Amino acid sequence: MITISEEAQAHFVKLLSKQESGTNIRVFVVNPGTSSAECGVSYCPPDAVEETDTRLTFNGFDAVVDEESAPYLDEAEIDYVTDQMGSQLTLKAPNAKARKVSDDAPLIERINYMIESEINPQLANHGGQVVLTELTDDGYAVLQFGGGCNGCSMVDVTLKDGIEKQMLEQFAGELNGVRDATEHQAGEHSYY
């Protein structure tokens, strides 16, 4: 479910040594499965553990996860990185915004999951997003861009060299291409 690097484990042990005995960490997701999902880590005193919580045992502490957050923390990674700017904990949870779908789920569900978990987080860097409006009978994903992507002069590159390339690779043999249904209007909202 959650991978915690050795560096992060050592950091948690150091932090927890200054807390009440029996205190562990809690890893959670606020607003799981939505575009506003946020992950967090907090102290978890012994009396804050619920019967339905999952305990993951690490070196010197447990990570406690509530029942609602658990599926959204699948494949989550916590690391403690040090660079010239200092040290910090990083938490990557690729399934926080959308629950992972099974490999045999309908194609439309797998495309929507890919959009929410991989594509939209990248587009969000430019204030944009994309939604799947249709999956045609002849195997084309019809997308609509919004936010900073609407009217952006780089949208064709994003569509063909980015999104379509990723989707055709991931859904080889199932998807024939990607089309843009957006009526692009350049304006101050456009990224480029």
From Swiss-Prot:
This is Fe/S biogenesis protein NfuA. It comes from Alteromonas mediterranea (strain DSM 17117 / CIP 110805 / LMG 28347 / Deep ecotype). GO terms for molecular function: 4 iron, 4 sulfur cluster binding; iron ion binding. Pfam families: Fe-S_biosyn, NifU. [4Fe-4S] cluster binds at residues 149, 152. PANTHER family: FE_S BIOGENESIS PROTEIN NFUA (PTHR11178:SF51), IRON-SULFUR CLUSTER SCAFFOLD PROTEIN NFU-RELATED (PTHR11178). Homodimer. GO terms for biological process: iron-sulfur cluster assembly; protein maturation. Its cofactor is [4Fe-4S] cluster. Belongs to the NfuA family. Binds 1 [4Fe-4S] cluster per subunit. The cluster is presumably bound at the interface of two monomers. Involved in iron-sulfur cluster biogenesis. Binds a 4Fe-4S cluster, can transfer this cluster to apoproteins, and thereby intervenes in the maturation of Fe/S proteins. Could also act as a scaffold/chaperone for damaged Fe/S proteins. Keywords: 4Fe-4S, Iron, Iron-sulfur, Metal-binding. InterPro entries: Fe/S_biogenesis_protein_NfuA, FeS_biogenesis, FSCA_dom_sf, HesB-like_dom_sf, NIF_FeS_clus_asmbl_NifU_C.
